[in-house]
Amino acid sequence: MNGTEFIAQILKQEGVNEMTCFPSNALIEEAAKTGIRPVMFRHERGAIMAADGYSRMSDGKRFGVVAMQHAGGAENSVGGLSQAFGDNVPILVLPGGYPLERRNVRPNFLANENWKGVVKSVEVIHTPTQIKDVMRRAFQALRNGNGGPVVVEMTLDVC
């Protein structure tokens, strides 16, 4: 089992039935295999806004989940994240991330560094052994306290 398979299983166990997304992110295929319906968008912000609307309509019982590619895909998401943060809307955001060996090469976009001011919580999965605990903390953050976007960046060589 690889990292994206494990994350998809956790999402399903947490009751996720739909996931908005923008290609290309390996989690999209793995989530579909577990029965999570991917809803594809033509722009990252649209996917985030749909996840935001899903969370708003479900009264805190379910959360919008969105997956997108790393780099430009993650960069295009900041507007939607800022809106969800400003309105205290809990959404789970799962961007891809650069492979560990290239994470600190400039000008790579690192979600965990760039989104700190517009999200409730942000973590990066560096090793497969972190997946269970990082995802547990992500869902705890979604369920507790003020709402807001929770980000789990999935490095390409781990997930």
Regions found by a protein language model. Give the residues of each.
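N-terminal alpha/beta PP-like core and its mobile active-site loop of ThDP/TPP-dependent enzymes
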Residues: 1-159
